Amino acid sequence: LLSEPVQTRREIGLQLGANAAIDPIHEDLTARIRALTGMDGVDVVIECVGNTIATAQAFSATKRGTTVLLFSVPKSGTTHPLSLEDVYQKELTIVGSIINPDTHQRAVDLINSGRIQLAPILTHRFPIERLKDAILMQMSSESLKVLVGSNYD
């Protein structure tokens, strides 16, 4: 299941294999997850945004035994009120993530194996002379991943 406010990103997520794509701005994310799974929540949540709203939504999607992976890079000083009772009652596992020396090689191996499709997520390409445009595009909600190189026109 994918939670994403931008329509084009939801569409790409569905193309890449998400069973459902939910708009967390206009839909009740927790209610949709419960309806789609037919149970109390999901087994694993990967939070990739880093803001307190997305983090709260991530924890609201949990059930007993869920693992919550906080994969995002939040702003320095960001805090989140966490119900320790929920952690206890639901037996949640909370995992932080940071890049490690093996990460890049594992990513390359996944790409080379064909298990990861890059084409749908490489949405824009810019020549080096248009670096400023590339940065602005990456900051917008119109892009997923932006490439900059000497071979792009």
Where are these regions (language model features)?
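C-terminal hydrophobic helical "lid"/dimerization subdomain
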Residues: 56-60, 101-153
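Hydrophobic residues in well-ordered beta-strands that form the structural core
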Residues: 2, 70, 94-96
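Adenosine-nucleotide cofactor-binding segment
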Residues: 1-57
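Rossmann-fold NAD(P)-binding glycine/threonine-rich loop
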Residues: 73-91, 107-109
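Glycine-centered, small-residue-biased loops immediately flanking beta-strands
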Residues: 66-67, 144
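Residues in the short beta-alpha loop(s) of Rossmann-like NAD(P)-binding domains
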Residues: 5-6, 74, 100
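Conserved catalytic-site loops of classical short-chain dehydrogenases/reductases
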Residues: 44, 67-68
